[in-house]
């Protein structure tokens, strides 16, 4: 899910700044250099990122592959009826990364933190959601091993390890990865310096992606890292709900005014503008309680007071005592979650730094040689993919291995070959079905030639008659 409304807020602030810039230009006022130098959202052509290493949230990538296929057509399944769309998607996505000389490091979720338990329960209740099983994950890991692609199984959330890889340096003083390839903005309050949006599922080097630079986001919004974390929590994230009636613009105004989440919550309580996270009975009818809302009716009236409501409804007249009690309980519970979420964002990477069990190996960070026969068997025999397409993909993989000089061995057994004789790749001629009347006899050939001559002669006469008619006119 990520941070609710964060990118909406950034885009709207960018538009506002662009309008202000045009006004300053018309009035002959110099541009505000402090704003110009910050570019929180930058559009890049994918091929420009050549030669880097990226961390990828594996679970998110799998979901994107499955739902992407659902939008374009029926899902792919193997002979046993098991879904395989994600395997095909990961296979070709890896090839696109390698084609651009990019090393992908996939990171899989471990045990979810207790703070995320409510979010997980909500997701389980969604009937239309693709359920990612342990078998699905294992199959993707086998595919990556056979292709020689590194991956990490996180001790906790993949988000944290992805952000840690991006923020920390190896023994040579170089960051493990340049950025995190994800659509989940949780990476930013966790401390990932770079986030790459719209890169999952990419299969074209000429496509555009969006690079989100944390340093520029902070500078553009005029916030410290701690203030930005509090803003993200106030907006709502995977670990807590947002406060109903307070959308992106008002959340930003509150953080700018009060600077900390504690003081914002204190202000809201004193102003009687917060009692529940499930209803907005104490919030204005004009409040911005969704990511698509407009904050035009909720402005800062002066430097000492923020007005986020106009016509407050009387909660006592519109609810009974039990409802009020439930609302207060909901509010208190969510506020506790918000404070825990802020602390989690601040300390998650430090816990990895101090962990004595989290150790990285070369196999988790570097490319290895691929296993040709096993990969063909895994994809074509076990999962029923077209042999010719997979063979073409493996040929591409071989060329990228050579161009990237991948020499690290990969001899461990990840998949036991099902068809020892190898996968049969049908020739093009096998795909041609001749009908009974098709023969190679000379008489039939002569007949076809005669028919062809008659057709050409008829066309010639038609053209001649047309020329004569045109000349008469």
From Swiss-Prot:
Disulfide topology: none
Biased composition (Basic and acidic residues): 444-459
Ligand binding (Mg(2+) 2): 184, 186, 238
Function comment: Single-stranded DNA endonuclease.
Taxonomic lineage of the native organism: Viruses, Varidnaviria, Bamfordvirae, Nucleocytoviricota, Megaviricetes
Compositionally skewed regions (Acidic residues) per UniProt: 288-297, 310-332
Matching InterPro entries: 5-3_exonuclease, 5-3_exonuclease_C_sf, HhH2, PIN-like_dom_sf, XPG-I_dom, XPG/Rad2, XPG_DNA_repair_N
Species of provenance: Acanthamoeba polyphaga mimivirus (APMV)
Record note on cofactor: Binds 2 magnesium ions per subunit. They probably participate in the reaction catalyzed by the enzyme. May bind an additional third magnesium ion after substrate binding.
Biased composition (Polar residues): 464-473
Residues given in the record as Mg(2+) 1 binding sites: 57, 109, 157, 159
This enzyme's EC code(s): 3.1.-.-
Cofactor: Mg(2+)
Region called Disordered, residue ranges: 278-332, 435-473
Low complexity composition bias: residue spans: 278-287
Protein origin, superkingdom: Viruses
Protein name: Putative endonuclease L386
Pfam families recorded: XPG_I, XPG_N
TM segment ranges: none
Keyword set, alphabetical order: Endonuclease, Hydrolase, Magnesium, Metal-binding, Nuclease
GO molecular function: 5'-3' exonuclease activity; 5'-flap endonuclease activity; DNA binding; metal ion binding
Family: Belongs to the XPG/RAD2 endonuclease family. FEN1 subfamily.
Gene3D superfamilies linked: 5' to 3' exonuclease, C-terminal subdomain, 5'-nuclease
Enzyme class: hydrolase
């Amino acid at each position: 899910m990520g941070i609710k409304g964060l990118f909406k807020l950034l885009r709207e602030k960018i538009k506002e700044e662009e309008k202000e810039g045009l006004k300053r230009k018309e009035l002959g006022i110099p541009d505000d250099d402090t704003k110009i130098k910050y570019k929180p959202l930058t559009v890049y052509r994918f091929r420009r990122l050549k030669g880097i290493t990226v961390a990828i949230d594996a679970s998110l990538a799998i979901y994107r592959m499955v739902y992407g296929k659902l939008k374009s057509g029926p899902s792919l399944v193997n002979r046993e009826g098991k879904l395989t769309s994600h395997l095909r998607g990961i296979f070709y996505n890896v090839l696109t990364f390698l084609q651009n000389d990019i090393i992908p490091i996939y990171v899989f979720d471990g045990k979810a933190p207790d703070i995320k338990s409510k979010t997980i329960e909500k997701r389980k209740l969604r009937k239309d959601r693709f359920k990612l099983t342990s078998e699905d994950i294992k199959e993707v890991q086998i595919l990556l091993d056979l292709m020689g692609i590194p991956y990490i199984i996180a001790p906790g959330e993949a988000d944290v390890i992805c952000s840690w890889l991006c923020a920390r340096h190896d023994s040579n003083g170089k960051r493990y990865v340049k950025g995190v390839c994800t659509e989940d903005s949780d990476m930013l309050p966790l401390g990932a310096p770079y986030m790459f949006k719209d890169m999952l599922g990419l299969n074209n080097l000429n496509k555009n992606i969006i690079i989100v630079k944390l340093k520029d986001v902070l500078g553009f919004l005029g916030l410290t890292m701690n203030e930005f974390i509090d803003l993200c929590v106030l907006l709502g994230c995977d670990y807590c709900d947002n406060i109903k009636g307070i959308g992106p613009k008002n959340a930003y105004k509150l953080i700018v005014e009060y600077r900390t989440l504690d003081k914002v919550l204190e202000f809201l309580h004193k102003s009687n503008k917060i009692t529940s996270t499930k209803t907005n009975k104490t919030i204005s009818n004009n409040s911005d309680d969704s990511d698509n809302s407009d904050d035009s009716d909720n402005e800062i009236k002066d430097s000492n007071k923020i007005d986020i409501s106009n016509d407050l409804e009387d909660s006592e007249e519109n609810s009974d005592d039990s409802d009020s009690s439930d609302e207060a309980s909901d509010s208190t519970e969510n506020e506790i979650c918000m404070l825990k979420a802020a602390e989690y964002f601040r300390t998650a990477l430090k816990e990895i730094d101090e962990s004595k069990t989290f150790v990285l190996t070369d196999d988790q960070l570097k490319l290895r040689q691929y296993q040709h026969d096993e990969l063909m068997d895994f994809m074509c025999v076990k999962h029923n993919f077209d042999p010719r397409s997979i063979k073409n993909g493996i040929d591409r993989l071989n060329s990228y291995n050579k161009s990237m000089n991948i020499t690290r061995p990969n001899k461990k057994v990840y998949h036991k070959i099902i068809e020892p004789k190898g996968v049969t790749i049908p020739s093009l001629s096998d795909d041609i079905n001749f009908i009974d009347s098709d023969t190679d006899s000379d008489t039939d050939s002569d007949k076809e030639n005669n028919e062809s001559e008659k057709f050409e002669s008829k066309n010639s006469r038609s053209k001649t008659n047309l020329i004569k008619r045109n000349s008469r006119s």
